[in-house]
A protein has these predicted regions:
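Short alpha-helix capping/helix-loop boundary micro-motifs
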Residues: 2, 26-30
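Short, surface-exposed secondary-structure edge patches
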Residues: 6, 31-35
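C-terminal structural segments of small proteins and small subunits
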Residues: 12-13, 48-78
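Short, structured beta-strand/loop micro-motifs enriched in basic residues and often containing a Trp
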Residues: 14-27
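Residue-level recognition of beta-strand microenvironments
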Residues: 20, 34, 45-47
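Conserved beta-strand/loop element in small beta-rich adapter and peptidoglycan-binding domains
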Residues: 38-44
């Protein structure tokens, strides 16, 4: 189980958030408010046909996220 970023996860993957980059601060704050925090479990539900955006599930919340935003989230695929 190699560490990677959320942008590299595939549909169906279940991931554990290990770290979120310090910058950009605004994005980090928004992710924290949505429940994307270290230790959270994320499931990749869908990826758009051109690869961007991706739909993820964090707890009971469904989110749509751009790949550029997903690159600041370090994960471990379970």
């Amino acid at each position: 189980m190699n560490p990677t970023t959320l942008a590299n996860a595939q549909v169906g993957d279940v991931c554990l958030v290990t770290e979120i980059a310090q910058k950009p601060v605004e994005l980090r704050s928004r992710l924290y408010a949505l429940g994307v925090i270290p230790g959270a479990s994320i499931q990749i539900l869908r990826v758009a046909p051109l690869g961007d955006p991706m739909q993820i599930k964090v707890g009971a919340t469904l989110l749509s996220m751009r790949k550029t935003d997903a690159r600041i989230i370090n994960i471990q695929i379970l």
